[in-house]
From Swiss-Prot:
Phosphorylated by BMPR2. The phosphorylation status is proposed to regulate the association with the cytoplasmic dynein complex and may have role in cytoplasmic dynein cargo release. Acts as one of several non-catalytic accessory components of the cytoplasmic dynein 1 complex that are thought to be involved in linking dynein to cargos and to adapter proteins that regulate dynein function. Cytoplasmic dynein 1 acts as a motor for the intracellular retrograde motility of vesicles and organelles along microtubules. Binds to transport cargos and is involved in apical cargo transport such as rhodopsin-bearing vesicles in polarized epithelia. Is involved in intracellular targeting of D-type retrovirus gag polyproteins to the cytoplasmic assembly site. Plays a role in neuronal morphogenesis; the function is independent of cytoplasmic dynein and seems to be coupled to regulation of the actin cytoskeleton by enhancing Rac1 activity. Required for neurite outgrowth. The function in neurogenesis may be regulated by association with a G-protein beta-gamma dimer. May function as a receptor-independent activator of heterotrimeric G-protein signaling; the activation appears to be independent of a nucleotide exchange. It comes from the Eukaryota. The lineage of its organism: Eukaryota, Metazoa, Chordata, Craniata, Vertebrata. Belongs to the dynein light chain Tctex-type family. GO terms for biological process: axon development; cardiac muscle cell apoptotic process; cell division; dendrite development; establishment of mitotic spindle orientation; intracellular protein transport; intracellular transport of viral protein in host cell; microtubule-based movement. It is found in: Golgi apparatus; Cytoplasm; Cytoplasm, Cytoskeleton, Spindle. InterPro entries: Tctex-1-like, Tctex-1-like_sf. The gene is Dynlt1. CDD domains: DLC-like_DYNLT1 (cd21462). This is Dynein light chain Tctex-type 1. Homodimer. The cytoplasmic dynein 1 complex consists of two catalytic heavy chains (HCs) and a number of non-catalytic subunits presented by intermediate chains (ICs), light intermediate chains (LICs) and light chains (LCs); the composition seems to vary in respect to the IC, LIC and LC composition. The heavy chain homodimer serves as a scaffold for the probable homodimeric assembly of the respective non-catalytic subunits. The ICs and LICs bind directly to the HC dimer and dynein LCs assemble on the IC dimer. DYNLT1 and DYNLT3 compete for association with dynein IC (DYNC1I1 or DYNC1I2). The modification N-acetylmethionine is found at residue 1. Gene3D superfamilies: Tctex-1. It comes from Rattus norvegicus.
Length: 113
């Protein structure tokens, strides 16, 4: 049991990170409708809140967080990422959030140090 707890303390736990990202999105965007003039502010708030909460976990990681907000207008979006890392310690998580007027896609990467 101690081995599991020790690895849990230094592991990238996707559910934990996903919840942090969702809370940051809800806090920054909440029930707002898409407004082009606010997108820069919203994306900045989402990534900064996410990074702040991730660092508060006190885990030995360097974090990378990206955020894309796009208006719902029928346009498509295709993205991809690739990482060369140690899959036993490093990890990533992508959260797609939406409301009636926009999509918000956040990716968080944790690199063990």
């Amino acid at each position: 049991m101690e081995d599991f707890q020790a690895s849990e303390e230094t592991a990238f736990v996707v559910d934990e990170v996903s919840n942090i990202v969702k809370e940051a999105i809800e806090s920054a965007i909440g029930g707002n409708a898409y407004q082009h003039s606010k997108v820069n502010q919203w994306t900045t708030n989402v990534v900064e809140q996410t990074l702040s909460q991730l660092t508060k976990l006190g885990k030995p990681f360097k974090y990378i967080v990206t955020c894309v907000i796009m208006q719902k207008n029928g346009a498509g979006l295709h993205t991809a990422s690739s990482c060369f890392w140690d899959s036993s310690t490093d990890g990533s998580c992508t959260v797609r959030w939406e409301n009636k007027t926009m999509y918000c896609i956040v990716s968080a990467f944790g690199l063990s140090i």
